[in-house]
């Protein structure tokens, strides 16, 4: 599936509504009331007339990898210079996209376009285990993991971030409970992406299990994730080997893009790819839901005939 067919994206400001809310009063991810005094991630249950479906995207990575700059470049079209973004505990930006979902949402009026609101979240944290909480992770639809190509330690941090996302998103059944709700559609639960653990055996490798006749349990699956290497414009100071980075991400079946918030290189592409993954999983989950409803209906008819 190519993400360009899923999204109708334009750089024209007349087609996109951008918003910045920076408030530290409430860092819980519950219901989004479209209130600037409530920094929340979660389901849109308020029939907001501005959009049809809310898609929460959590940006994770070391400090100073450029998460805030990328968010501003994507939602507002500029690169922040001389802006102090590090005192903002919860940095929230959003962008509205016309014709979102590739037919995922069925409108009562087919001539009215579906508006998807991408809400970007950036939590500034001293320790990656501090915030967001497990519930907050599970209320997120997709993740962008950042590293700075001029800072190798930020790249080495990726494995910890991936396992953190894996652990905090999965419930006891290794499923994902994150939802995005629409005014004119079914509630869609996020379906897991079939990625494998970095330590799991790859194709062609044999599993070392000589001491046990029982295979270890499979690791919890990963939600939709895109990894980005920011500051790719700074070629002279690049220390992360792009070939090694691609090999690592390929081993996880996670898309990798080298981007630049400064020059806008591949910024839109990264978000488009993530949205494509989210839409794909929503469609899979909806097909599963319809199949389950059909099975229940058949079972109900059988029970009625037996009476």
Swiss-Prot record:
The keyword Nucleotide-binding appears for this protein: yes
UniProt protein name: Ras-related protein RabR
Source taxonomy: Eukaryota, Amoebozoa, Evosea, Eumycetozoa, Dictyostelia
Propeptide residue interval(s): 305-307
Gene that this sequence comes from: rabR
Listed GO CC annotations: plasma membrane
Motif (Effector region): 83-92
GO annotation terms (biological process): hyperosmotic response; phagocytosis; vesicle-mediated transport
Membrane topology field: Lipid-anchor
Family, per entry: Belongs to the small GTPase superfamily. Rab family.
Top-level taxon of the source organism: Eukaryota
Residues at which GTP binds: 61-68, 122-126, 230-233
Subcellular location, principal: membrane
């Amino acid at each position: 599936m190519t993400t360009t067919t899923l999204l109708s994206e334009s750089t024209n400001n007349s087609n996109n509504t951008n918003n910045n809310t920076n408030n530290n009063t409430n860092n819980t991810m519950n219901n989004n009331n479209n209130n600037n005094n409530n920094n929340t991630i979660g389901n849109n249950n308020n029939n907001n007339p501005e959009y049809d479906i809310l898609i929460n995207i959590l940006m994770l990575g070391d400090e100073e990898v450029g998460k805030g700059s990328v968010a501003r470049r994507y939602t507002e079209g500029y690169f922040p210079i001389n802006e102090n973004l590090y005192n903002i505990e919860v940095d929230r930006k959003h962008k509205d996209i016309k014709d979102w979902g590739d037919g995922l949402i069925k409108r009562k009026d087919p001539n009215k376009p579906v508006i998807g609101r991408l809400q970007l979240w950036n939590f500034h944290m001293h320790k990656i285990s501090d915030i967001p909480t497990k519930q907050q992770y599970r209320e997120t639809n997709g993740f962008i993991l950042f590293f700075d190509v001029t800072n190798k330690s930020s790249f080495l941090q990726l494995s910890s971030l991936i396992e953190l996302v894996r652990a905090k998103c999965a419930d006891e059944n290794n499923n994902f409970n994150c939802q995005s709700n629409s005014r004119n559609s079914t509630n869609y639960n996020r379906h897991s992406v079939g990625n494998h653990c970095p330590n799991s055996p790859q194709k062609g490798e044999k599993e070392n299990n000589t001491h046990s006749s029982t295979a270890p349990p499979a690791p919890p699956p990963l939600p939709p994730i895109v990894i980005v290497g920011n500051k790719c414009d700074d070629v002279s100071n690049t220390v992360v080997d792009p070939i090694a980075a691609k090999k690592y991400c390929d081993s996880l079946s996670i898309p990798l893009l080298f981007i630049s918030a400064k020059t806008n290189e591949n910024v839109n592409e990264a978000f488009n790819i993530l949205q494509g993954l989210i839409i794909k999983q929503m469609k899979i989950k909806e097909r599963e839901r319809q199949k389950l409803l059909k099975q229940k209906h058949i079972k109900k008819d059988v029970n009625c005939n037996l009476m």
